[in-house]
Amino acid sequence: MRAVDGSADRWTREVAARWRTAADDVSTLLDRVDRLGAELRERPADLVVCHGDPHLGNLLLDPDGRVWLIDWDDAVLAPRERDLMFVLGGVLAFAPVTPAQQAAFFAGYGPVDPDPVRLAYHLGVRALDDIGSWARDAADTDRPEAERVRALKIVDGLLSPVGLFTLARGALRDLGRWD
């Protein structure tokens, strides 16, 4: 990081500072997700069609009040917790899912008994993927400055007290898996 600080542009230095601050937690989360992954491989789940990215930004409400799920480019066969993490854990720092929204979702989705270990695993994977990709975008000198600024703001949101990284850490704490 010292080399980055001495020779990099402002946005690379900014994201490097965030990364330095979060490095121990990122490393711990990676370790915990790896352990959960190994544990979950020993007890496979039923696979269902998952959207892969069903956050509020991928929902449309039509004039008749029907909800449409758009942007299916991340669709995958996976345990249902892969999508349920968006409703039960939330992934957008600026738009946490409320209990009323969860109730409305499950009224349409139907009864389900999600596995908290799978939820924590998928939250952790998503948090690691997001922090890595958005930090990379913020440091990418080939990107326009506005995109880099936006990426840095998203990194800040991920690491915020209500951000996805914090949610993933909380899910692991709830399981007794975060010291």
For each feature predicted by the language model, list its residue ranges.
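Active-site activation/catalytic loop segments of kinase-like enzymes and analogous catalytic loops
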Residues: 81-114, 124-142
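ATP/Mg2+ or Mg2+-diphosphate-binding catalytic cores
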Residues: 10, 132-179
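Short, flexible active-site loops
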Residues: 7-18, 66-72, 84-90
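Hydrophobic packing residues in well-ordered alpha-helices of helical domains and bundles
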Residues: 19, 26, 124, 148-152
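Phosphate/dinucleotide-binding and metal-coordinating scaffold of catalytic cores
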Residues: 2-7, 97, 117-120, 143
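Active-site acidic catalytic loop and adjacent metal/ATP-binding pocket
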Residues: 34-85
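An alpha-helical support segment within catalytic cores of ATP-dependent transferases
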Residues: 1-51, 174-176
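Hydrophobic alpha-helical membrane segments, chiefly transmembrane helices and signal peptide h-regions
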Residues: 26, 54, 61, 127-133
